[in-house]
Amino acid sequence: RKREGLLQCVFEEGKTKFDLKELKEASTIEVEGTVRAEHRAPNGFEVRLDTIRVLSESAEQLPFAISKWKLPTTLETNLDHRAIALRNVRERAKFRIQEGVVRGFRDFLYSEGFTEIHTPKIGAKSAEGGANLFRLEYFHRPAVLQQSPQFYKQMMVGVFDRVFETAPVFRAEKHNTKRHLNEYTSLDFEMGYIDGFEDIMAMETGFLQYTMKLLERDYAKELKMLGVTLPNVEQIPAVRFDEAKQKVAEKYHRQIRNPYDLEPEEEALIGQYYKEECGADFVFVTHYPSKKRPFYAMDDPADPTYTLSFDLLYHGLEITTGGQRIHDYQMLLDKIEKRGMTTEGMEQYLSAFKHGMPPHGGLGIGLERLTMRLLDEQNVRETSLFPRDVTRLEP
C-alpha cells in the first residue's frame, strides 16, 4: 500500500534470503525488483521481488483487517482507531476527493479575483450570537470560539473587495444526529460591489461546475473506487422559501407546522420534488424569513419580513447558507436596535461600515456535508477526518 494506491508484489521462494513468514501485517517495508505488466494487478503492473527490507515492524496485531475492500467494523470502532482505519484504500479515497473539493474552491475563487484570508478563531463576541457558543477563559477574560468568520469577512470586503477562507468553525449545539458536527470546516467567501444576492448564487454555481470538472479529471480513480456519480450542476433551480413550503405541502400532503424555518423533512422533500420535476440534484431556496436570519442579513425591500438570502440544498440536505448583507451603517444600527441587541463588542465591526462599505454578500459551505452528499454517505462523521461531536473528543 502506497500513496498512489495498492502495489502488487510477487515473492518467489529462494530468490531472496528473506523469510516471508517473519513479515507482520502493517510493517513498513522497502522493496526492489523487476516491474512487469500484469493486467490483473492493481494499476496494471506488479513487482517481481529481488530484495525486501523491513523499515519498521508492527508491534501488535491490527484491530481489524485494513486490507478488506470495505472495513469490517462499525463507524464507532472506525473512529476509535481512526489513524489505522484511514489506511484502508477506500477510506483514504474519501479524503482525496475532499481535498479536490477544497482545491476546486481555492482555484476557482483565485481565478475570480478573490484574496485568501486567515481570521482568528478566538474572540470576545460571535457574529451569529445566541447560546450555541463554546466559552473559554482567555487570560482571565471571557472569550468564545468563533461560529463563523462573518464579521472579519465583511470587514475585509472593504479592503480586498473579494475574500475567502477555508477554516474550522465551532458550534456548541447538542445535536447527536447524522448531519451535525460541533467542529467542521467552512468554505467561506464574501464579495463586494454586487448587484444582488443572485451574484452570490451564480458564484457558488460556478464553483460547483469548476469543481465537478476538476474531480472528473484529477480524481477519476477515487471516484471509480467509491462508485461516485457526480451531480448535475449545469443549472441549479431556485425557489422562494414560502413557495417551496407550499409546493411540498401540496405534492406530499404535508401540513406546514413551522412557517419561519425549514424542518429537515421539508428540506428532504424539496430535494425530492426538484429531482422528480426537473432532475436537479441541487436547489437554491431563497428569501428566508427575517426573524430566522442574523441581524446583518439584508431585508427584502419589497417585503421586509423576508431577506435577500438563500440556502443551497443538495439532495435535500442544506450545505450552504448565504445572501446579501446590510452595507449601510445606519441601517445596521436600526436592525440591531430593532432586535433588542447591544453594539457592545461590535465596535470594530461597525467602524468599517461607519467609514463606507460597498454592497456585498457571501456564503458559508459545510465541507463535510458537501463531501457526505458527493459520496452518498449516511453520516457526516464518515467525511470528517477526526470528527468532533457531542460525545467525541478523541482521537
Describe each model-derived feature in a short phrase.
Residues L62-L71, L181-N182, E204-G206, D299-A302, ...:
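Short intrinsically disordered coil segments
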Residues E25, G158, R162-E165, L181, ...:
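TRNA-recognition modules of translation machinery and tRNA-sensing kinases, especially anticodon-binding
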Residues A127-E128, G206-H315, K338-S351, H355-G356:
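Metal-assisted phosphate- and nucleotidyl-transfer catalytic regions
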Residues G192-I200, T205, K245:
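Extended, domain-scale alpha-helical bundle/helix-rich regions
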Residues A93-I97, G227-V233, T320:
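Extended, non-catalytic structural segments that build the interaction scaffolds
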Residues G100, G104-E112, S148-G158, R162, ...:
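Generic, well-ordered alpha-helical scaffold segments in large soluble proteins
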Residues R1-I194:
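Class II aminoacyl-tRNA synthetase-like tRNA-binding/catalytic domains
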Residues P72, L79, A83, V102, ...:
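Alpha-helix initiation and N-capping motif
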